[in-house]
Amino acid sequence: MLEEKLERSVEQSAAALTAMADDFFDHPEVGLQEFHAFETLTGWLEKEGFTVERGIAGMDTAFRAVWKHGEGGPNIGLLCEYDALAGLGHACGHHMQGPAILGAAKALKDAAIDAPYTITVYGTPAEESISGKVVMLENGCTFEELDVALMMHGGPATQVDVKSLALNKLKIIYHGVCSHAALKPEKGRSALDGLIMACQGVEFLREHVPSDVRMHYTIVNCGGTAANVVPGYAEASMYVRSYNRTELDGVVARVRKVLQGAAMMTETEVEIIEEKSLDNKIPVLALNELVMEQAEKVHAPCIRPARQKTGSTDFGNVMRHVPGTCIRVAFVPEGAAAHSQEYLDAGKTEAAHNAVVYGAKILALTGAQLIEDPEKLEAIKKEFHENLAKELNSQS
């Protein structure tokens, strides 16, 4: 039976896959510096017979690996991340993704399913820092040759996301005029005053935005340490989020007016630099249901309904081009937060090793279902295009 064959393949690779995950955990690499993980993953895929392209989309640690069985048929995309957090190591579980994806890719390759199909593995670096998938898209890697894009991520429960928050990251700089705060205060124009008033304006704005909107900021440069100098420079970083891109664009426009108004009131100048823009996911319920069915088949731990409260991800931008989903597999206690000591402490546990194996099995079984059942795949693609059209129409 095909399902048993796929699971057996993953189990036979389990020791190598979990050892690889432990190795990545012990050698954490931040975004764009993931050279060890990159070489390990691409080398393994090459040995398995995949055609590997390194350094794609203008990113040294991005890759594409392709294996074809016959001509035509669906192209199953498997995407992985492998960057760590600066100062925290693999406290988000990215060390498990690559090994799980390789396990699924090898199982699907070795299965030699009767129908023609292609397996494409994408290595997508720097998710935590510069949202590498966005950079890849901007550099011409659209992922549109894929019929579906699948990911795995560790978490406190085995579940999928129904949605994600669209995000705009703003770098905000106020320029003022320095002056002696006691001798010539009238000559000064405080950049810090402008920034403080902007932050106060954002606080008042909270009352007048939809309930799902999140606005958070930090002052990264307060303009100096001498109280007797009117600050000529002040800088902040701000995230604005919403579950709907159209809604978010409207809120960001209002935030910009607040920032400009604060500059006007303090006779300072403001620079507003958009550093990052992430789209919300386009959910495909049929694909989510299919993935969760496979999770139940392999008896994955702590199976729960889809997450309703989520963060932001560059996978949302990919999901504007191709139907996709990410299965989260339990390896930390329920209630544990990502980017935490709990995630770090669990990184090399038996639960983490099991999550790699479960993730590989779930994605392998999902891929096989889509290869063997073209009607199921077409229904997923149809739902995706309908949901995408609704989203885009709401923006017009």
Show which residues each predicted segment covers.
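General structural feature for long, well-ordered alpha-helical segments within catalytic domains
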Residues: 2, 13-20, 33, 37-44, ...
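Metal-dependent amide/peptide-bond hydrolase catalytic core
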Residues: 196-396
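Non-cysteine beta-strand/loop elements that form the S-adenosyl-L-methionine
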Residues: 77-79, 175, 326-332
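Acidic/His- and Gly-rich active-site-bordering loop/insert found
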Residues: 2-118
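General beta-strand structural signal in soluble alpha/beta enzymes
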Residues: 53-56, 121-123, 150-152, 304, ...
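Short strand->helix junction
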Residues: 27-31, 85, 181, 245, ...
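Histidine/acidic-residue-rich, glycine-tolerant segments that coordinate divalent metal ions
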Residues: 61-67, 83-91, 95-96, 102, ...
